[in-house]
Amino acid sequence: MAGHSQFKNIMHRKGRQDAVRSKMFSKLAREITVAAKAGLPDPTMNARLRLAIQNAKAQSMPKDNIDRAIKKAAGADGENYDEVRYEGYGPGGTAIIVEALTDNRNRTASNVRSSFTKAGGALGETGSVSFSFDHVGEITYKLSVGDGDKVMEAAIEAGADDVESDEDGHYITCAFEALGEVAKALESSLGEAETVKAVWRAQNNVPVDEEKAQSLLKLIDSLEDDDDVQNVYSNFEVSEEVLAKLSA
């Protein structure tokens, strides 16, 4: 997106945050279950599970919910989820990547395709837009860990590639392959991160006007409302004037 703060301001527009939060815990629980099933149910022995729990705690997910999600992975009748990535184009030729965890590929593909079509977009083949994104690691810290200079110094020492700081926190970017190593090094200097995850970062942003931005937001809302969808990434950019209207 066009920087962390701009996209957060858009997506946190009036009334939207509560709707997203109502589904957040179920999505976090699904990632915890998948992570626990993919390895050992012990976070000290399972890096993916450790990160999933860490990210859930950052969103104030209750411990009971976390424990229940881990136990669900051990159940003989538990669902098996597939990790699927969808790629397509939204209004204005914008590129969109959708990550999902699903127990029914046909259902999820149908729902995602329907969302794209209704918004005037089109679902493409795998690889049709991901080439214009970088798959990187992102580690976030609260402002309370220190100023930008302190975080930058720690990030460089840890082998990170970039740091962005705004009024909401510090965002550290590193190579996807080095995410675990960089996160561990940062933990020794800055303490436990708020979130540690892999993200798709657009190489270049596509400017869109207010009308197309509204259509894009409806598309993203529709995708995020799907229980199977875990993450949505895009490369659109709006002017400050349009941003103010969208965030009102």
Swiss-Prot record:
Subcellular location(s) per record: Cytoplasm
Pfam families (alphabetical): TACO1_YebC_N, Transcrip_reg
GO biological process: regulation of DNA-templated transcription
GO cellular component, one term: cytosol
InterPro entries for this protein: Integrase-like_N (IPR017856), TACO1_YebC-like_2nd/3rd_dom (IPR048300), TACO1_YebC_N (IPR049083), Transcrip_reg_TACO1-like (IPR002876), Transcrip_reg_TACO1-like_dom3 (IPR026564), YebC-like (IPR029072)
Main localization of the protein described in the UniProt heading: cytoplasm
An example molecular function term from Gene Ontology annotations: DNA binding
Record's keyword terms, sorted: Cytoplasm, DNA-binding, Transcription, Transcription regulation
Family: Belongs to the TACO1 family.
PANTHER family reported in the protein's UniProt record: TRANSCRIPTIONAL REGULATORY PROTEIN YEBC-RELATED, TRANSLATIONAL ACTIVATOR OF CYTOCHROME C OXIDASE 1
NCBIfam families: PRK00110.1 (NF001030), PRK12378.1 (NF009044), YebC/PmpR family DNA-binding transcriptional regulator (TIGR01033)
Protein name: Probable transcriptional regulatory protein RL3983
Organism annotation: Rhizobium johnstonii (strain DSM 114642 / LMG 32736 / 3841) (Rhizobium leguminosarum bv. viciae)
Origin organism lineage: Bacteria, Pseudomonadati, Pseudomonadota, Alphaproteobacteria, Hyphomicrobiales
